[in-house]
Amino acid sequence: MLPARLACGLLCGLRRGPAPAAACYGPARWLLEGKCEVPIRQRASSLGRRVPPSSTATEDYAEGPDTEERFLFPEYVPERTPEEQVRELQELRELQQLQQEKERERLQQREERLQQKLRAGFRTLPVPEFPDASVPPSGIYCSGCGAELHCQHPGLPGYLPEEKFRDAAQAEGGPARTVCQRCWLLVHHGRALRLQVSRDQYLELVSAALRRPGPALVLYMVNLLDLPDALLPDLPKLVGPKQLIVLGNKVDLLPQDAPGYLKRLRKRLWDDCIRAGLVVAPGHQGPQYPAGDEPLEEIKNQNPSSRSRTVVKDVRLISAKTGYGVEEMISALQRSWRYRGDVYLVGTTNAGKSTLFNTLLESDYCTAKGSEAIDRATISPWPGTTLNLLKFPICNPTPYRMFKRQRRLQEDATKAEEDLSEEEQSQLNQLKKHGYIVGRVGRTFSYSREQDEVPFEFDADSLAFDMGSEPVVSVCKSTKQIELTPEDVKDAHWFYDTPGITKESCILNLLTEKEINTVLPTHSIIPRTFVLKPGMVLFLGGIARIDFLQGNQSAWFTVVASNFLPVHITSLDKADALYEKHAGHELLLVPMGGKERMAQFPPLVAEDITLKGGGKFEAVADIKFSSAGWVAVTPYSEGTLHLRGHTPEGTALTVHPPVLPYIVNVKGQRMKKSVAYKTKKPPSLVHNLKKHR
């Protein structure tokens, strides 16, 4: 494209035609009459000066000593009128537009040629442009949730839009590592789609997997925040005559209320297992009761003949997120279960099964190649993320592998935090922010692609005639995705992640995805303590309420729930008006959406509670509001407390012995002119690291 000034000059010259000759006087007249051509570049330099000897004026020209000095004058260019300037600019714009249109057409033709080449190389797939039940499923399962991929109906698990389904089928290797629309939205946008999957379908899928022939071990994962309702009442019927290990997950979220709190949590989990009708394995001591602490009456009076044949081999506390207790669990599985059969991970929704699946996938419990070939499961606080079975091959714990693993664990235990790399220290600091206790999960053996892709090439003739030559080993760098071959999985045993079983009367069934992210704790819980006297009310968001109706003295109420769920204290006579005004708004936060949301949300239902006080600084009971958390009640002195709890209609409110009986001690000083105490967060501890030097 021409510069504006140059283009304007050219147009101006073409429009005017030849310029008029300048008037010449004196001896210079004969130069013009003789058609003397003086170069333009010489005119400016010779203005008012004598013509240099090298100039070529005419063939007759001869300079003598008496020759008079000659002058040349520039041509006269008349000024342009405004109309001419406007016309020139308009012509210039038209020229520019013409050039832009030609450039645009050239680029468009180039793009069309490229698209034709791409379409020529694609395979066609008979998939309609809209969901259609006549299109058969792909036969390939989502690597995030395990559902079969299809484009039949958006409300069914494994759905992919038509374009994504076609692109996945046309990709190299097919849709083997593709995730469904639901997993994609969960991971990349934090959105969850409600699917048409009932609780009976979940139970049937899990029970069908557990009925498979052959020996199998069941790992039943419970959320410690759901105690004592973490165990399903029909668990023995679901598991059947199989060996069982109970894993108490999310222990990293609970603060230490007193020394020995982990032992008390483990004993509490043992009691719940026995109360659910499970049998302790022969030779196992079961729950250990400290001196003066006896088992519950319903456990002592339980008829052994009425119990099921489901045997509990062990109870362990772990954190699938921070890694606490995971290495010890792997060692126990390799010692006791070894390689006798498949292992199934079972539990309710939001217990953390997919997180443990991903942690074990990168540990010594999975084969080295399987860790590289299998995608991680989709993790989300939304209940029911996993919709089908996910699996990875279990590593056979041979004596050599167990020896190398044990030596690695011993070396890791001798390291201090300062000895770790910057990347490991950064990851460890992030885990400390998420939980109170942290454990490091490592890997002893790693897989390299060259183990399977190093061909042994040689020339037979050269070996026959030249004994000094060596075979040539060439390493072929491949960019293909690592995949398990039939030889890799021959006679292999698998670790299965099963879909979570939905709980009835759970408050999560009433909440939206944004509300669930607020209610479910994902970081270490900081207890919040308030001192209330009779006639006061505690609101836990807009989903729970406790009225202190009557009591001899004040009492401490310690909230153990998500740090993002607000707590509001008011008087009994103002409580109803406050809830009517602020429910669905910022003060109570959950539910969200104002009057329209509250019109769909069920009303709060009241239930009277009577508690008898015990020792000072020890809670007498926990008031649990489904999966939203609990409030530990600690009276000042012995006496009777009359309370009233409120929960949404259709959800469960339970009163049970305190999980953390000394939680009231985890508080700061009382705020001035307030019923609240300053919060205090206990320090985080790393389990398998050497102490600071």
Curated annotation (Swiss-Prot):
InterPro entries: G_CP_dom, GTP-bd, Mito_transl_resp_regulator, NOA1/YqeH-like_C, P-loop_NTPase. Keywords: Apoptosis, GTP-binding, Membrane, Mitochondrion, Mitochondrion inner membrane, Nucleotide-binding, Phosphoprotein. GO terms for cellular component: matrix side of mitochondrial inner membrane; mitochondrial inner membrane; mitochondrion. Disruption phenotype: Mice display mid-gestation lethality associated with a severe developmental defect of the embryo and trophoblast. Primary embryonic fibroblasts isolated from mutant 9.5 dpc embryos show deficient mitochondrial synthesis and a global defect of oxidative phosphorylation. Pfam families: MMR_HSR1, YqeH-like_C. The keyword Ubl conjugation does not apply. Expressed in tissues associated with high mitochondria content including testes, heart, liver, brain and thymus. Also expressed in various bone cell lines. Residues 203-504 form the CP-type G domain. Residues 43-67, 286-307 are annotated as: Disordered. GO terms for molecular function: GTP binding. Homodimer or multimer. Interacts with mitochondrial complex I, DAP3, MRPL12 and MRPS27. This is Nitric oxide-associated protein 1.
